[in-house]
Amino acid sequence: MTKAQSIAEIKQLLQAPVTEEQLATFAADSRAGVQKLVVQYHKRAAKLAAQKAAFEERRQTEKALWPDYPLVAGIDEVGRGPLAGPVVTAAVILPHDFDLWQVNDSKQLSFKLKQELYREIMAQAVSVSIGIASPERIDTENIYHATELAMGEAVAGLDKQPDYLLVDAMTVPTDIPQEKLIKGDARSISIASASIVAKVIRDQLMINYDQQYPGYDLANNMGYGTAKHLAGLAELGVTPIHRRSFSPVQNAL
């Protein structure tokens, strides 16, 4: 007689996809612990299926364009709201077979997953380019125009000229046909990829700045006006990476 698998063994097996036959065997197991594991497995499978379906829905934006515009670039920015640091923009052209289903609005992703997806996007993308709006440019041009210019630089820096642009809630100063998508990082895989690239790069910049300018908690707040950041401004004053046109910084001058 074959010895029944332990609940611990079944739990380990159900961490990965199993065959319908295996699942039926576990479902017929009368032990309450096994029944609980089967329910959890079905919930995880349903969640995964929903995430993949949502990715495919976002991918439809690009698929509708590809027959006429084979090279579609998604453009997004990170960092318009902080008191310190640059705005980082990214332009990303994805291959038509891109299927990294976890790619979504970077605000929905954990720090670790963003790092992993960043590496995959950089490896798989047809082309990636970055544009930077420095604090000085932000103060000179205003935040919106500085971001537009940085987006234009990101597009110009692509090593393949895109046929069409999908832009998150802004307009890029270029003659290339484009579409402005509100909440585009949740509607387009190219924009979502650009948001991840821009976010990871900007976060690393702010972590580096935290070493250069300690006392503002920049590695944690990423330049946003948290209580610790404002306390640092009050105690230590303004650094070269602060945006002097932003009122909380002006108050510390």
From Swiss-Prot:
Keyword Nuclease applies: yes
Subcellular location: Cytoplasm
GO CC, one annotated term: ribonuclease H2 complex
Statement: the UniProt record of this protein carries the keyword Cytoplasm: yes
Gene Ontology annotations of biological process type: DNA replication, removal of RNA primer; mismatch repair
Cofactor: Mn(2+); Mg(2+)
Gene3D superfamilies on file: Ribonuclease H-like superfamily/Ribonuclease H (3.30.420.10)
Protein keywords: Cytoplasm, Endonuclease, Hydrolase, Manganese, Metal-binding, Nuclease
Superkingdom, natural source: Bacteria
Domain RNase H type-2: 70-253
Record field: catalytic activity: Endonucleolytic cleavage to 5'-phosphomonoester
GO molecular-function terms, A-Z: manganese ion binding; RNA binding; RNA-DNA hybrid ribonuclease activity
Chain residues that bind a divalent metal cation: 76-77, 168
Note on how the cofactor is bound: Manganese or magnesium. Binds 1 divalent metal ion per monomer in the absence of substrate. May bind a second metal ion after substrate binding.
PANTHER family for the chain: RIBONUCLEASE H2 SUBUNIT A, RIBONUCLEASE HII
Family: Belongs to the RNase HII family.
Function of the molecule: Endonuclease that specifically degrades the RNA of RNA-DNA hybrids.
Protein name: Ribonuclease HII
Organism: Latilactobacillus sakei subsp. sakei (strain 23K) (Lactobacillus sakei subsp. sakei)
